[in-house]
Amino acid sequence: MSAKEIRFNEEGRNAILRGVNALADAVKVTLGPKGRNVIIEKSFGSPLITKDGVSVAKEVELENKFENMGAQLVKEVASKTSDVAGDGTTTATVLAQAIYKQGSKLVAAGHNPMEIKRGIDKAVEAIVAELQKISKPIKDHKEIAQVGTISANNDKTIGDIIAEAMEKVGKEGVITVEEAKAMETSLETVEGMQFDRGYLSPYFVSDPERMEATLENATILIYDKKISNMKDMLPVLEQTAKSGRPLMIIAEDIEGEALATLVVNKLRGVLNVCAVKAPGFGDRRKAMLEDIAILTGGKVISEEMGFKLENTTMEMLGRAKRIVVDKDNTTIIDGDGSEADIQGRVKQIRAQIEDTTSDYDREKLQERLAKLVGGVAVIKVGAATETEMKEKKARVEDALHATRAAVDEGIVPGGGVAYIRALNALDSVVLPAEQQFGVTIIKSSLEAPIRQIADNAGIDASIVVDKVKNGKEAFGYNAADDTYVDMLEAGIIDPTKVSRCALQNASSVAGLMLTTECMIAEKPKKDSGMPAMPGGMGGMGGMGGMDY
């Protein structure tokens, strides 16, 4: 085990402060509409130019291990806020720096850090409750577009595309962001349920020009095992052929004579049929098959449930108005499932989303939910260069997260104004003397975001804070135009969730750093230098009689 270095008390906290300042000073220059750019060197390719706080934070790594711990803790604030709310990373970093800076001065002056932390926690509770009171629910297309625009660093086209996507697939729908081949940013939407499995044989294609199989008013056989034996499938094929409706088969796999028979029947025009593999793997596959069954009003033919393929009747098959299958995807449009069953399934998936601790599982559950409820929209981000494309894609993803957050918990006036308006809640928070210092810290720290926005715009921050404090409700400072306006009317808004998470995460980590009394890091290894080269070879005797 290698030797460790230990820092105690003031020495440790000062090292943390230097690290916090190094990271926060790099990140906070990006805050607000007049935020500056940060250029990040990349080991290959051109440098990255960004105004995204979390991208800047991720790049900061300090040489001194103790200072680096401080920087990494604040980085945690930024990434946690980004994960939960999708935006507010820079605000969270600015708040964490302000809280820790003031708190460390008080601790250095001999005040009890544990009591200060308790005061901070109680003050934050009061502010969060006040933010929720100020919060205004978001409803229409225009407000959604405004949130998207602000989170995308005032890019109106991105805001409009996000609002359009949410309108088309609903707030539960899946919206994904991809890089486009063209220079324009565009939106593509998929109605109904789509999964990533294409036809098992190109002979199922009904539209050779587009290489698609389209089934109108189709019946759907959903089976959870492989089908290789034709005779098991014969009864259901005969019943479907009599009904004259197309048949879609979704199974773990279809091979051998079963697949050959389906292809022959399709080519001869006896039966309009198409077969695809079931989506997903393992338990997730079972769940997705059940989703498809509920959406189409059918049953999963599973031996576990006591159903056998050869005993399948027409009543067990699902139905859909239209199914489109290409070589990669299957889309089921307008399934015949009952609304009550679909809503029951949606409730069940929502409960699973709340219970799960795995981010991966949560993402997959949300995808399943979206496929049942709304649909899928794809925003294709276009740009002139690869550098611009990466930067723009990051902004679109941020804006999308923030817009979802706004739909979840509503909006508050942006530009740091919500924090100023929530300050009144602290007047009623009266605590013992040492804890009251925590309230004082939060009181002044909540001014930090609006001060930084003004600083980045090149305006005197004290004048801005004073004017905003004397105003009422949504009155605030618009740094983009250097004017004082009603922030809600001007469309300068923040999702309540973003403001709440930024403050909660910042105060949580700042409180932990304030109550740190000891730091341990690995001692840097001393380079022993390169080993000495072996001595030179002895001189060679004269080589008599040779001409040179």
From Swiss-Prot:
Gene Ontology MF terms in the entry: ATP binding; ATP-dependent protein folding chaperone; isomerase activity; unfolded protein binding
Segments forming a coiled coil: none
Domain of life per record: Bacteria
Top EC class for this record: isomerase
Catalysed transformations (reactions): ATP + H2O + a folded polypeptide = ADP + phosphate + an unfolded polypeptide
Binding site for ATP: 30-33, 51, 87-91, 415, 478-480, 494
Compartment list: Cytoplasm
InterPro entries xrefs: Chaperonin_Cpn60_CS, Cpn60/GroEL, Cpn60/GroEL/TCP-1, GroEL-like_apical_dom_sf, GROEL-like_equatorial_sf, TCP-1-like_intermed_sf
Major subcellular site: cytoplasm
Single GO cellular component term: cytoplasm
GO terms under biological process: protein refolding
E.C. designation(s): 5.6.1.7
Gene3D superfamilies in alphabetical order: GroEL, GroEL-like equatorial domain, TCP-1-like chaperonin intermediate domain
Keywords for the protein's UniProt record, in alphabetical order: ATP-binding, Chaperone, Cytoplasm, Isomerase, Nucleotide-binding
PANTHER family, per the entry: 60 KDA HEAT SHOCK PROTEIN, MITOCHONDRIAL (PTHR45633)
Function statement: Together with its co-chaperonin GroES, plays an essential role in assisting protein folding. The GroEL-GroES system forms a nano-cage that allows encapsulation of the non-native substrate proteins and provides a physical environment optimized to promote and accelerate protein folding.
Family per record: Belongs to the chaperonin (HSP60) family.
Complex formation: Forms a cylinder of 14 subunits composed of two heptameric rings stacked back-to-back. Interacts with the co-chaperonin GroES.
Protein name in UniProt: Chaperonin GroEL
Gene source species: Trichlorobacter lovleyi (strain ATCC BAA-1151 / DSM 17278 / SZ)
Gene name, Swiss-Prot/TrEMBL: groEL
